[in-house]
């Protein structure tokens, strides 16, 4: 990260940074109880430490600028740790950390660097390659046991894969990743426009997508119901 910082400063011939976008993220590490510790910690490291280390590396250069803004990407899973009733622990824990860190910086910057703003971005379903890239980053060939667990999760999410072979599950994973990107209600270009417009207005809390706004409203309106199995199904039908 420090090498990246040095290269950015050198390429732009400056020691000051005005905008820092922390946007790295992968999935994986679904179950804390039964999942791989290595996969869990890799997902958490990318999603949380990617934000922390980059902010730590660039903070002095942001503070030394006349005006600065830190933009951290959390998720709807940073305030609602659910994914269709299936385990989603590492990603959600990391995105909660990003949201908490960003909110804590508001007072810190107001006191110690009032010319620097911070925003936390909470996207809903955006058409990106995160599902596909997660597999590339986590690496390794899936075992039949891995595929069986994935199959069980797909069934819980309502996918008709009961009679699928391991090879068919692999193909379904690929198709799901493509569908996640191509069938999203909000494209990455639309998300970028929403985020940049909100940053210009110096909003600290940026919800991206109608689904994100709806889920935020539902969770705030009925927090005790947010993790009931029926909550997820009812809300999906309403979006």
Outline where the language-model segments fall:
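Conserved NAD(P)H cofactor-binding loop of Rossmann-fold oxidoreductase domains
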Residues: 23-28
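The catalytic Tyr-X3-Lys active-site helix of short-chain dehydrogenase/reductase
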Residues: 81, 88-97, 101
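Conserved amphipathic alpha-helix within the SDR
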Residues: 1-15
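Residue(s) in the substrate-gating loop at a strand-loop-helix junction
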Residues: 75
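Substrate-binding pocket helix/loop in short-chain dehydrogenase/reductase
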Residues: 31-32, 39-41
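A short, exposed helix-loop element centered on a Lys and neighboring polar residues
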Residues: 55-56
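SDR active-site lid
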Residues: 111-206
């Amino acid at each position: 990260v420090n090498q990246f910082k040095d290269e950015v400063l050198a390429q732009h011939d400056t020691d000051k940074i005005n905008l820092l976008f922390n946007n790295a993220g992968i999935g994986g590490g679904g179950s804390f109880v039964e999942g791989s510790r290595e996969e869990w910690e890799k997902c958490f490291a990318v999603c949380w430490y990617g934000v922390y280390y980059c902010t730590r590396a660039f903070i002095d250069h942001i503070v030394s600028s006349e005006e600065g803004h830190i933009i951290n990407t959390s998720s709807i899973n940073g305030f609602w740790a659910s994914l269709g009733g299936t385990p989603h622990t590492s990603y959600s824990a990391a995105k909660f950390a990003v949201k908490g860190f960003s909110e804590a910086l508001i007072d810190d910057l107001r006191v110690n660097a009032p010319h620097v703003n911070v925003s936390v971005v909470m996207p809903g379903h955006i058409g990106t390659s995160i599902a596909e890239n997660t597999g590339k980053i986590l690496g390794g060939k899936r075992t039949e046991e891995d595929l069986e667990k994935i199959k069980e999760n797909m069934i819980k999410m309502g996918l008709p894969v009961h009679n699928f072979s391991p090879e068919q599950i692999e193909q379904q994973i690929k198709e799901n990743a493509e569908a996640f990107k191509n069938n999203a209600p909000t494209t990455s270009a639309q998300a970028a426009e929403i985020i940049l417009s909100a940053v210009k207005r110096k909003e600290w809390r940026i919800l991206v997508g109608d689904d994100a706004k709806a889920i935020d409203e539902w969770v705030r309106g009925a927090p005790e119901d947010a993790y009931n199995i029926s909550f997820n199904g009812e809300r999906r039908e309403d979006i």
